[in-house]
Amino acid sequence: MDYFPIFCQLQHKACLLVGGGEIAERKARLLLDAGALVTVNACEFAPQFHHWADQGQLSLISGEFVPELLADKWLVIAATDQLSVNALVYQSANQQRIFCNVVDDPKRTSFIMPSIIDRSPIMIAVSSGGKAPVLARLLREKLEALLPQHLGQLAQLAGNLRQRVKQHFTVMTERRRFWEKLLTHDRLAQSLANNDHVQADQHVEQLFSAPLTDRGEVVLVGAGPGDAGLLTLKGLQQIQQADVVVYDRLVSDEVMNLVRRDAERIFVGKQSGHHCVPQEQINQILLQQAQSGKRVVRLKGGDPFIFGRGGEELEELAGYGIPFSVVPGITAASGCSAYSGIPLTHRDHAQSVRLVTGHAKKEGQLDWANLAAEKQTLVFYMGLSQAGEIQQQLIQHGMPATTQVALVENGTSRHQRVVSGELSQLALLSQQVSSPSLIIVGSVVSLREKLNWFSSRHHDDQPKVTECVAHVG
């Protein structure tokens, strides 16, 4: 360990900053955020320093650095572009046993300033010891994305409750269980994120009055269309906190690799014509796991409320009083169209978009006349087996046979493949792809050649329609 990690209490402590430029300005912000009494020494000062001085937030001393400026200082930072000045600051501070940081000079530094994630009072520091500051910054950015903004409020709330918890729960195991419930309470977290402190206080009171026996919950999470990079931050947080993850065939391996390692995984994959697990049994799995006190994530491809039967599953849970919440995902229509270079709406082509299931209930009848109207884009989910019917009905109800269509197979993944042609060829084209595939119908498909960015970048095989038709024939 090259450096001993330590957090300093600088509230009302005198600190010296040598330098008046842009880098010094960044260091000054950090010192001011920490509540330090900051004195800045430089020959020239950036405008922000004068603003701070006018506001009484810090003091300015104009002129060359002299060692006497270190009197009564707790620490000093040298942030000038003159090596000789920085060296003098370090040497003088060292002689007086004052911690000194010289920016970008590890050899003349007695302490380093790491990359920080500030969720006060939670503070996280990342340092490479000056060896790879860019790597430290990249790690900080990843952590910044993972940690919710309300984390500091949650920590502050926990601190305010410590004494009350000690008095209310005399047994240590009960205290631990209470803290676990409070710190993983989704609705409390959401209230804090919304700055709704009244609602947050209500959730806290419910936790104090509720029995400490484990009570599970279900979080319905949309995994997106395939590319793990399209999983939302909140979705990622949920799958990394889950005790159990119930997932289906449309959830990519890349997304599943992000699930908490010790979480139980239950596969309930479904596909057209073959249900590995009946929907009623899936409902029972969710119910039983939640009733046993587990934190359950129901992970669905795309968005769970768009042809994902998420509403049906939650209705079942609601009937038994099981707490639940929903994390939306990027639906296949949005992901597949974007990764195929096909805008769903365009001022010159389509003023509306319709999402249509290819597997409605048998008694359901689509309004084909409206679907065949001009100036709109149609996106059919689970429509491969019905491609012939879709082609026939749309043409029969007035849509031109030359209308452009595209079929997107394994959209947004590295295995994505797109075939395109005319509506009159849809049935034949459907034989060139396999499930999961999405059907897009509308003149916006004609923009694909111009806007296709993903397949050209990944060198995907993109067979032409003429090749598909010739192959089928």
UniProtKB/Swiss-Prot annotation:
Binding positions for S-adenosyl-L-methionine per the UniProt entry: P225, G301, G302, D303, I306, T331, A332, M382, G411
Family matches, as HAMAP family: Siroheme_synth (MF_01646)
Role: Then it catalyzes the NAD-dependent ring dehydrogenation of precorrin-2 to yield sirohydrochlorin. Finally, it catalyzes the ferrochelation of sirohydrochlorin to yield siroheme.
Region annotation (Uroporphyrinogen-III C-methyltransferase) ranges: 216-473
EC number per UniProt: 2.1.1.107, 1.3.1.76, 4.99.1.4
Pathway assignment: Cofactor biosynthesis; adenosylcobalamin biosynthesis; precorrin-2 from uroporphyrinogen III: step 1/1; Cofactor biosynthesis; adenosylcobalamin biosynthesis; sirohydrochlorin from precorrin-2: step 1/1; Porphyrin-containing compound metabolism; siroheme biosynthesis; precorrin-2 from uroporphyrinogen III: step 1/1; Porphyrin-containing compound metabolism; siroheme biosynthesis; siroheme from sirohydrochlorin: step 1/1
SUPFAM superfamilies: NAD(P)-binding Rossmann-fold domains, Siroheme synthase middle domains-like, Tetrapyrrole methylase
Designated gene of the protein: cysG1
Phosphoserine: residues carrying this PTM: S128
Tagged with keyword Metal-binding: no
Protein's organism: Yersinia pestis (strain Pestoides F)
Family under the similarity heading: In the N-terminal section; belongs to the precorrin-2 dehydrogenase / sirohydrochlorin ferrochelatase family. In the C-terminal section; belongs to the precorrin methyltransferase family.
Domain of life: Bacteria
GO MF terms, alphabetically ordered: NAD binding; precorrin-2 dehydrogenase activity; sirohydrochlorin ferrochelatase activity; uroporphyrin-III C-methyltransferase activity
Transmembrane stretches, start-end: none
Keywords for the protein's UniProt record, in alphabetical order: Cobalamin biosynthesis, Lyase, Methyltransferase, Multifunctional enzyme, NAD, Oxidoreductase, Phosphoprotein, Porphyrin biosynthesis, S-adenosyl-L-methionine, Transferase
Reaction catalysed by this enzyme: uroporphyrinogen III + 2 S-adenosyl-L-methionine = precorrin-2 + 2 S-adenosyl-L-homocysteine + H(+); precorrin-2 + NAD(+) = sirohydrochlorin + NADH + 2 H(+); siroheme + 2 H(+) = sirohydrochlorin + Fe(2+)
Gene Ontology biological process: cobalamin biosynthetic process; methylation; siroheme biosynthetic process
Pfam families: CysG_dimeriser (PF10414), NAD_binding_7 (PF13241), Sirohm_synth_M (PF14824), TP_methylase (PF00590)
Active-site residue list: D248, K270
Record protein name field: Siroheme synthase 1
